[in-house]
Each structure stands twice: as structure tokens, then as C-alpha cells.
Amino acid sequence: MTILNKYPKQTKERNKVFFEKQELTNFDGPKWGGWWDTDGSFSDYKRENKRKKPYMHKKAKLALKDRQPVELFSKTFETSLIYNEWKTTTPEPYKYEYIAKAYVAGLCAEKAVWFTKKVYPYLIKQEKKDFAAKLLGYRPESKDFADWTPQEVRNYLATALEGDGLFRVRGEKTICIDGQLFSSDVQYLSDIKYLAEKKLGVTSTLSEKCTYKTEEGIKTKYKLCIYGSSKNPNNIGFFQSLVKDGVMTLDRKKQKVQEFVGQAWRK
């Protein structure tokens, strides 16, 4: 474990200053909701302090192989950025050992509770809502889909696609792009499809991608695909909006969208 950017430990005084500063900023719930529904986690489990007294350890953590989003989270919420490497094994039947790498940043205790309360209204995946409710000890209200703004839906989609999705650009005379989001939770993808259509006018397709084996049994992976083409105006405005400043947080995926937007504009 290597600490790349270290912040002081939490104290009541430091947290008071932190929360006061955060009240003066615009918390982008949809952006972090997209990340937490894909790659973020909430945990709540028993630990012991130095006096062997048990307590519930609460944590909201983001861990990725890409540094950029985790570093942004670290700086935004003043928590240390850590780099980890460890040995792990791929699932059956292609079982082999390799070195996994991840950048990690997490909020603990009072800051974890604060963050979870703020992001909960913008969580869409039921599994993540359940973990968040366990951390908080109660279930807050989710934001009604009817009340989401187009900007909120765009910001959520941007980070969800960065987390569990991909962008693929192809073609020469006609330039095309696929924005694909994957999940084994078909209801989650259905909800996103509905939001994108209602709030952004984005058309998409939802289909079965593959089945795979887990310890819990056979699961199905689904794919939500948003298609864009230089010969078809549908969805081009959506892809153009993704490359605006502050929307996407991962340059290697943003560059794919920029490639499409730049070439489609010239066509």
C-alpha cells in the first residue's frame, strides 16, 4: 500500500470546518451517484478500537484501476488517496493468478454518513440503496424520477458509463459511436433507459449480452446501448454534452467521445 496524497485524520474540529466548507459548494449528487452505483461501495461492520471496545465502522469507498476519478474524490472530500497492489485469481474456468492494481479513497465515520445521506437520493441501483440504508441505519427518500433535471441525468449517465461502460468509435465515411453500459441488474438498466429517454430524449436499446458463472450460480449480463452516427441526428446532442467541462471525469473514455464529436461535426 502506498499513500499518494495524505490528509490528516478526522477530528470533530476538522470535520466541523469540512462540513461548513461543503455547505458553500454544489454537491454533485448525480455524478457521485453514477460512480457509486457502478464502482463505489458502502460498508458497515464491527471493529474494535485501541481499548478493545467494539464499534460500527462505516465507510463509503471508491476503488478503481484509473487514478483520475479517485483522485478527484480524494481532493473534493479531503481524504487520502492510496494505491494498492495484490495477488488475485480469475474466476473459473480460466483460472490464473495475476497482480490486481487499484487507486482507493474512502470516507469513514461521520464523513461517510454525511456523504451517504447526500448521495442516496441519486442512487438508482437497489442493491446500492440497500447497502447505503444499512450504513445509515434508516432508508432516506430517493429522488423521484419525475424530479430529475436533464443536467442531473446527463451527469449520472456520464459517470455510470465511465464506471461500468465503454465507448466504441468506428467507421470512416459514416462515423458511429456506441455508449454501452453493462449490468446483471436488468431493472437498473431499464430505469436508466427510461430516465435518459424522458429527460434527454436519448434513444437506446436494452439486450442480453451473455451468461456467466458465479459462486451464487448462473447470472445474465445485460447491455444498454446508446448509438450515435454522423448521418443521424438522434443522440448527437447527448454525446456533445458529455465532453463539456466537468461532466466526464476519466480522460481515456472522454477522448473516445471527443473523437466522435469532432469527426461527426466535420461530416
Where are these regions (language model features)?
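Internal intein/HINT superfamily modules and their associated LAGLIDADG
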Residues: M1-K267
